[in-house]
């Protein structure tokens, strides 16, 4: 059964534009290779963080809306955790 999810992740500000694009493509690939379908990718760009994380106070924000099986978010979470440059991430199930 496919469910709708939304993920927001923040990449380290020291990454250049190419590295950010590569990371976004990597995460999109994880979703698509896991049988999910991407509905929307919204790159918010560099923004100030609400609070300092690891001595960093800004980062590159990206939002991805996708539809996937319930097992896929666990794999996506694992990939976020092992990827250098990801400061924070969250994956939530959309009920709407």
Go through the PLM ranges and name each one:
Residues 2-96:
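Structured, basic alpha/beta domains of bacterial-type, RNA-associated proteins
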């Amino acid at each position: 059964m496919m469910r709708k999810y939304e993920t927001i992740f923040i990449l380290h500000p020291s990454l250049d534009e190419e590295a950010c694009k590569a990371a976004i493509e990597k995460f999109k690939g994880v979703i698509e290779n896991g049988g999910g379908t991407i509905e929307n990718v919204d790159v918010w760009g560099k923004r100030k963080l609400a609070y300092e994380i690891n001595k960093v106070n800004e980062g590159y924000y990206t939002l991805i809306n996708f539809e996937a099986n319930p097992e896929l978010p666990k794999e996506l979470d694992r990939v976020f955790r092992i990827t250098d440059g990801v400061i924070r991430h969250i994956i939530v199930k959309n009920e709407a």
